[in-house]
């Protein structure tokens, strides 16, 4: 099967459809080469601090960050931020919506933390999602804007009667590709390797005045927190355009260039229209197909940035992905733990909608010949 050769005129111009790490634009790599003078220099000095400032300013512009909100960052990616939030944003107890691997992982991290109460977990099966909701016993309400493992997107909207509870949104794969009103969240956190077309290892968060006050209060409470996961330390350094420990300069350069590209093309509105175009092409193809169907049955929950497409039992999705990979069309395999006969397609802002259409034509071509 792997010897099938897809005609060149059918193939996408860029065959990268991974859900993270994701496609990096060639211009970003040129920016990386042009930034050579920054490599091997101190992250406490002006050149690198200016780069961090450029990233923070770019995020503020992209998300039209309200007055009083700020952008903080640290090393370790969203995985590290789960623990940082458990230590530094939850006062007593949290509520988590879980509907896939990554939304469940934050809840699991909180459950293991000895300084906070057992979380309330509202669970839905993969492919669906619970309605955002509140509980009077919690001071943090958390869910994922986009569940990367399943292709389910849940809008960011404060639940009724949420009171003073902080709304903490995992936007790892949603930020920069899905619509959002940042004022509806208190901590909107993400990483660069999805819509921002960069490398991993960094977390960033847009935080509200209420979140900043909570961070300060917990920081002064005497709760033990490892310095690496300390949000007060992250805030202190971020306001100086620094990270607590040495960042990867290349990651920051790629991120800064992608932010410039997004903002230069029209900002979040432009990016959302682009991902909507890509996803409409993918889902329309699947709905018209004789062998493929969108895994997420409710169109309102279907993600614009990560599409999961189930195949009929008589079509081996793994075999299709293998042929695609052999032809330079890569990372369409499903999330490993989901265990479904499907393809998963990233449609982040850097992905050309025309390439999504080309991908669907290639899948049809391969399936006809298997």
UniProtKB/Swiss-Prot annotation:
> Could you give a GO molecular-function term held by this entry?
L-serine-pyruvate transaminase activity
One Gene Ontology term from the biological process aspect of the record: L-serine biosynthetic process
GO cellular component term, pick one: cytoplasm
- Keyword Amino-acid biosynthesis among UniProt keywords: yes
UniProt pathway annotation: Amino-acid biosynthesis; L-serine biosynthesis; L-serine from 3-phospho-D-glycerate: step 2/3; Cofactor biosynthesis; pyridoxine 5'-phosphate biosynthesis; pyridoxine 5'-phosphate from D-erythrose 4-phosphate: step 3/5
User: What Pfam families has UniProt attached to this entry?
Assistant: Aminotran_5
So which cofactors does this thing need?
A: pyridoxal 5'-phosphate
Principal localization reads cytoplasm
For this UniProt record, give its keywords in alphabetical order, as a comma-separated list.
Answer: Amino-acid biosynthesis, Aminotransferase, Cytoplasm, Pyridoxal phosphate, Pyridoxine biosynthesis, Serine biosynthesis, Transferase
What are the disulphide bonds in this sequence?
none
Q: Where does pyridoxal 5'-phosphate bind?
A: 102, 148, 170, 193, 245-246
Give the UniProt subcellular location, in the record's own words.
Cytoplasm
Region: Disordered; residue ranges are 1-22
Q: How is the cofactor bound?
A: Binds 1 pyridoxal phosphate per subunit.
Establish whether keyword Amino-acid biosynthesis is in the entry.
Answer: yes
Q: Which SUPFAM superfamilies match?
A: PLP-dependent transferases
- Stated EC number for the protein is 2.6.1.52
- Lineage, top-rank taxon, reads Bacteria
Q: How does it assemble?
A: Homodimer.
Report the protein's function: Catalyzes the reversible conversion of 3-phosphohydroxypyruvate to phosphoserine and of 3-hydroxy-2-oxo-4-phosphonooxybutanoate to phosphohydroxythreonine.
HAMAP family listed in its UniProt record: SerC_aminotrans_5
Task: Indicate the family of this protein.
Answer: Belongs to the class-V pyridoxal-phosphate-dependent aminotransferase family. SerC subfamily.
Under which name does UniProt file this protein? Answer: Putative phosphoserine aminotransferase
Kindly list the organism's lineage: Bacteria, Bacillati, Actinomycetota, Actinomycetes, Mycobacteriales
Gene name as annotated: serC
